[in-house]
A protein has these predicted regions:
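Short C-terminal beta-strands that terminate individual repeats in beta-propeller domains
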Residues: 44-46, 83-86, 129-132, 171-173, ...
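Beta-propeller domains
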Residues: 21-74, 107-124, 266
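Conserved strand-to-loop turn within each blade of WD40 beta-propeller repeats
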Residues: 27, 107-110, 152-155, 163, ...
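Canonical WD40 repeat/beta-propeller blade segments in eukaryotic WD-repeat proteins
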Residues: 6-15, 81-97, 135-142, 229-245, ...
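WD40 beta-propeller repeat blades
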Residues: 270-367
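Terminal intrinsically disordered, low-complexity extensions flanking WD-repeat/beta-propeller proteins
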Residues: 3-14, 30, 48-78, 165-221, ...
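Short coil/turn segments that connect the beta-strands within blades of beta-propeller domains
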Residues: 19-21, 100-103, 145-147, 243, ...
Length: 486
């Protein structure tokens, strides 16, 4: 039997529930949960309906035929056919959860849908809501009380919506379609008699119909949501940050866009108030990060070959940190910036698109980033999560493309595919950092069971589409003439 590739984990997140430690992940069009201790797969969503051994007995119903007789038709068979229909999305690019791991928020790709799940005690997902946004979400954040979702989209807007929607439909006063009323002709075919005027009337009626249909299409979502702020460029990342003050906590929304801007806005209900900007990048910004243990600092990166460290409350650049050698001509795309605290060290981890190295820095007291020995993985780094109590990193890697490339596929799949690797921090005597493999039993179990398969014989066109699902940020780069890379 020929081997096939496996969808890599696009997102991974460790959560600690009262009942168990879980690892949540997305790969292709599916969401997964695993035991972080054993690696056992607990659940997937949408559920795999290939096995019928747990299905209830078929129900029969009588259906009349054209000849006047009747035949029995299986309701289960009809439901099975519906369940076999492929999902309306091909990937789940954004996954986050509440701090206690009870609720998971996932964004499914093509349908622009924000889905909220409740994680059950057995690790299964119960979907509570699905809300289709006006534009495709590019980043999701939760407010400090974890009752509100903030959604940044590719149109440049940030909306807020409740984590758990109320059962009551929001009372939204309908807007009078004044334009349609004014544009509708007052004449009818009873008052117009000449052929020329009749043709003009038909054209006016057709135009009025199109305007009415366009007005209906432009109506916004029916669920509760509020527009908080907007950029003139598509948003690439967003953070919600809470800072303590003498009287109460001050909240902020930090947004980054394709046009090299980082904006600092006040939190709701004053999100329209702009505190300042952090300006200094010369290419698009793809990721911003505020360490939980050092919220006064902001680390940003994107299409430049360096990171920037900011005092973001003042809009002041503190440090510029190179990511590649000056002699390197390769274009850089920062895939992810993660902050974690392992032991007494505050670490900043950085992944670049198409790189099998995870760059590691320690965040010093003055905000500077001290380079450490990078971690070398078996494939391109896709996502990182940490188990801070165990000084451990879990890293998802791309086992489909050749390490170091975003478009060239490996000659053949491996068995099993390496989807996840784990390392434990080892601190040297003189402050140097080292890493040793760990959790090999758990990662081995996860890798062994795999995800959905990708045929090794996939055609080039389909391969290109799958590449774009993982490595599309490079298209944010502008050409020298000010256009976009297509």
């Amino acid at each position: 039997m020929a081997l096939n590739f496996q969808y890599p984990f696009q997102c991974i997140q460790f959560v600690e529930r009262p009942q168990a430690k879980l690892l949540l992940a997305s790969a292709g069009p599916r969401l997964y949960s695993y035991s972080a201790e054993t690696g056992q797969r607990l659940a997937s969503w949408p559920q795999d309906t290939s096995s019928s051994d747990q299905e209830p007995p078929e129900k029969k119903r009588k259906v009349s035929t054209a000849e006047g007789g009747s035949v029995e038709e299986s309701e289960t068979a009809e439901k099975t056919e519906k369940s076999k229909a492929p999902p309306a999305w091909s990937n789940i690019p954004i996954v986050t959860s509440t701090s206690n791991g009870e609720y998971v928020i996932a964004v499914t790709g093509e349908d622009k849908c924000i889905r909220v799940f409740q994680v059950q005690d057995d690790g299964s997902f119960q979907q509570l809501s699905e809300r289709i946004m006006p534009k495709r979400p590019s980043s999701i954040a939760l407010t400090s009380d974890e009752t509100t979702i903030l959604c940044a989209d590719k149109f440049g807007d940030v909306h807020s919506l409740p984590l758990i929607p109320s059962n009551e439909k929001p009372a939204v006063a309908p807007r009078p379609n004044r334009e349609a009323k004014l544009s509708h002709p007052a004449a009818t075919n009873l008052t117009v008699h000449t052929k020329g005027n009749l043709r003009a009337l038909e054209q006016q009626l057709e135009l009025a119909k199109k305007k009415k249909e366009a007005g209906e299409e432009k109506s916004g979502p029916s669920f509760e949501h509020h527009l908080l702020l907007g950029h003139v460029s598509l948003l690439t990342d967003m953070l919600f940050v809470s800072l303590p003050s003498d009287t109460h906590k001050r909240t902020y929304i930090l947004t980054a866009d394709r046009d090299e801007h980082i904006r600092v806005s006040r939190g709701p209900p004053q999100a329209h108030v702009i505190e300042n900007y952090c300006l200094g990048h010369t290419a698009f910004i793809s990721k911003i990060c505020v360490p939980r243990d050092a919220p006064e600092y902001l680390i940003s990166g994107g299409g430049d070959n360096y990171l920037m460290v900011w005092n973001w409350t003042e809009g002041r650049a503190l440090h510029k940190v190179p990511l590649v050698e000056d002699s390197s001509a390769a274009e850089v795309v920062v895939r992810g910036i993660w902050a974690t605290t392992l032991g007494d060290l505050r670490l900043i981890l950085v992944a670049l698109d198409g790189s099998s190295q995870l760059q590691c820095f320690t965040l010093e007291a003055d905000g500077s980033l001290k380079p450490q020995t990078p971690l070398d993985l078996t494939g391109n780094v896709l996502a990182v999560t940490s188990i801070e109590k165990d000084n451990t990193l879990l890293i998802s890697v791309d086992s489909v493309r050749t390490a170091g490339s975003t478009n060239e596929w490996r000659a053949s799949p491996s068995a099993p595919s390496i989807l996840l690797e784990a390392f434990r921090l080892q601190q040297g005597t003189e402050g140097s950092l080292g890493w040793e493999p760990t959790l090999q039993s758990a990662t081995g179990a996860i890798n062994a069971v795999g995800t959905l398969e990708i045929a090794a014989t996939t055609e080039d066109k389909k391969r290109g589409e799958l590449n774009d699902l993982l490595y599309a940020m490079s298209k944010l780069r502008k050409t020298p003439r000010g256009g976009e890379d297509e």
